[in-house]
Structures are given as C-alpha cells and as structure tokens.
Amino acid sequence: MTNLRKTHPLMKIINQSFIDLPAPSNISAWWNFGSLLGICLIIQILTGFFLAMHYTSDTLTAFTSVAHICRDVNYGWLLRNLHANGASMFFMCLFLHVGRGIYYGSYLYKETWNIGVILLLTVMGTAFVGYVLPWGQMSFWGATVITNLLSAIPYIGTTLAEWIWGGFAVDKATLTRFFAFHFILPFIIMALAIVHLLFLHETGSNNPSGINPDSDKIPFHPYYTIKDALGAVLLLLVLLPLALFSPDSLGDPENFSPANPLVTPPHIKPEWYFLFAYAILRSIPNKLGGVLALLASILILMIVPHLHLSKQRTSMFRPFSQTLFWILTADLITLTWIGGQPVEQPFIIIGQLASMLYFLLILVFMPLAGLFENYMLKPKW
C-alpha cells in the first residue's frame, strides 16, 4: 500500500514542503530564521485575534479598552505583552533573515527575494498601523507625522493624506480604518509567505558555500524539523522573559499617556525597528527628498540582485565583501541609534553621513568589491 502522505492531495503538498523536501546538508543556523518568522506570524495572529475581541477602535475608548484588557481580561496582560514584544522578535528575525540573504547571495533567487522584499514592506505597514491602535501620545503623533509625509507628493499629496485620514486630521475614521488594515494585513502576509515558499521550493535552498548542492541533499525531516524546533525553543526563551519580566523596555513611556492633539511630545519617534529608516528620512532637510530616501532605503533591496558582479555567490570566501557587509551592519546600528536621538548636532551630521554611507555601500562599494575579487581570482603568471 502506498503511503498516504505521498498520495493524498493535501498531505502530498505538506510532505513535499516539510517532510521529504531535499535540503542541502550544510545549511547553518542562519537558515533557521524562515521557520522562526513563521512561528512569529502565528504567535502574532493568535494573540492579535484574542486582543481584537476586547479592543474598541474608537478614539474615546481605544486607550481605556487596552487598559481594560491588561487589568480585567483573563491573561489579557500576557496577550498584550506577547503581541507587543512578539513584533520586536518578528523584526529581529526579519533583519537577520534579510542579512543572511545578502551575506550568502540568496538574493540571486530573484522571485523569492522580490516576494521577500514585498513581505518586508507589508510587515512594516502592519506594524505601523498596529502601533497607532493603543491611541497613546506616541501612537497619535507617530500616525500624524508619518501619514503627513504623503502630503509631500506633488499635486495629489494633500488629497491623498486626507483620503487616508478620512477627514482633515488623524481622528476616529483613521483609527477605525487602521484597525481594519491591521486585522486583514497578517492574512495577506500569510498568503505572501506561502508564495515566498512556493518560489523557494522551485529552486531549492541556497547554502553557505554557494555551490550547487544537488549532489549532497538530505530529507528535511527529521534533520531540519529538529533543528527548527530547537530554534523555536530558543526564540521562546528570549520572547517569554522579555514579555514576562520587562514588557515595556522596548516601548516609549510617552504611550502611557492618552492621545492629546493639543500637546506634542518633546521627541516623536517610532518603535526601534523603524529607527534606521526614520534616521534616513530625517537626514534630508527637504520633505519630499526625505520621503523618497525613506522609500529608497527599503526598495534598494529590489536592485541588489542586479548589482551582484562577483563570480562567487556567497561572501564566505570573499574577505573584502565580508568587511563591507559588516560595515553595513554597523552603519544600520548607527542609524538605529541616531533615529532615537533628538534633532541636534552632532546627531544631524552623523545621521547624514551614515545615510550616505548606507546607499554608497550597497550601490557602489559592494559591486566594486565583487569586481576587485574577480580580478584577484585571475592567475597573475
């Protein structure tokens, strides 16, 4: 009798994706983040679903409904803390996943990579509209500042901003539609993640060496199911202490005050995972220029595959490219720090230099390093 998992129409898909999938034998822990992102998404959808049962998307009651969840709902405090800190874990895994893709040349699977960039943008959008929902001071002013950037678009900007707001400013209509967006987007993310996997399984996984691994494959189960399970345990070992012992350490104290359109916080800033892009936005004195730089900081990932000029796929055997990659990492950490600082010297000039270096590294230095390494590979005698 033929095994059911190999013949049943639904089981067959699961089998080919997670059980009998041929995987390279040498993929390292850096390949764990895909499954960790899947776990993060499931945690976010489940906790968000239960939070949505008790949340009210009205300007008068949104803030108090969140307080009610934390005080009166059974384990409401845990749901909220897991959801808020789960977002931080989600972005941490996302950044490491993208970093792995850049370091090991995974971006050469162009369809998988481009869907991944769209996923990154969608997750960022979801996190932004979600941050507005508690209707604290930073929620309100963050929404005001970021949506106001739309008005920088020539001709249609103001109309577009008012269309998003549902009025002449961020108000009840804005909050209601942001809640609707925040509810629907995770399911769109889930669909995109399936497409992401679909394209990945067309080519198979890349590996640290960048060499075609077809001659040395092992089944996904039990080897990588066990490895992914270990990754999941480690993820929870970070998330649970964070959510249970220090749930507010990554948030802004300003958000403990209800939204007040008449009082501006001394320093408006987004959550830590947006600070690098926020620093790039602020580094350009012109409003439209800042918006374009903000978009370019993420969309630049789309052209990374076309800037790959090296004959080798990964950075594993390319010391110059490795050095530039770690400079880029340090630069992004610097931008994250700058994004959280007030707009004054020396932070302004540091932010401008770090922003310029970010674009130069990706557009100029990394492709040149690839060409230089190609030249170094040629025999000189």
Swiss-Prot record:
| Positions that bind a ubiquinone | H201
Compartment(s) of residence = Mitochondrion inner membrane
Give the cofactor binding note. Answer: Binds 2 heme b groups non-covalently.
Q: How does it sit in the membrane?
A: Multi-pass membrane protein
On assembly, the entry states: The cytochrome bc1 complex contains 11 subunits: 3 respiratory subunits (MT-CYB, CYC1 and UQCRFS1), 2 core proteins (UQCRC1 and UQCRC2) and 6 low-molecular weight proteins (UQCRH/QCR6, UQCRB/QCR7, UQCRQ/QCR8, UQCR10/QCR9, UQCR11/QCR10 and a cleavage product of UQCRFS1). This cytochrome bc1 complex then forms a dimer.
Q: What is the purpose of this protein?
A: Component of the ubiquinol-cytochrome c reductase complex (complex III or cytochrome b-c1 complex) that is part of the mitochondrial respiratory chain. The b-c1 complex mediates electron transfer from ubiquinol to cytochrome c. Contributes to the generation of a proton gradient across the mitochondrial membrane that is then used for ATP synthesis.
Other remarks on this protein: Heme 1 (or BL or b562) is low-potential and absorbs at about 562 nm, and heme 2 (or BH or b566) is high-potential and absorbs at about 566 nm.
Q: What is this protein called?
A: Cytochrome b
Which gene underlies this protein? MT-CYB
